[in-house]
Amino acid sequence: MSIGILETVLAIYRDPMRVAEVRDRPLPEPMAPVIRVAAGDAGLAAEWAGASGESREDIAEACVFFLQQILFAPGADAYRVLGASADAPQARLREHYGLLMRWLHPDRN
């Protein structure tokens, strides 16, 4: 479980005024679980809900909010949009791309 990233996601969700400070920093790691929850991974959302005391719905909303505000910020480069740094391995870029497509593609089930 990635408690560190969960704490960051929930902090931004609870206090949106912190978005600007997080946008100015390198992305926290690992980002894949955040994208997985946004893409509908109910098991991970339930695990995080149990660890945090939040509802699964709030966990999912917090992940979506985090991604919208931090990855898709104006001026974000292509790597940041994928939830990675410029030195990320190709496999991570592919994984994040697939997860983002699962979340955002209009033909998703």
What is the meaning of each model-derived region?
Residues M1-R80, A86-R94:
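Short "pre-J" leader segments immediately N-terminal to J/J-like domains in DnaJ-family
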Residues V81-A84, E95-N109:
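The canonical J-domain HPD catalytic loop and its flanking helix-turn segment that engages Hsp70
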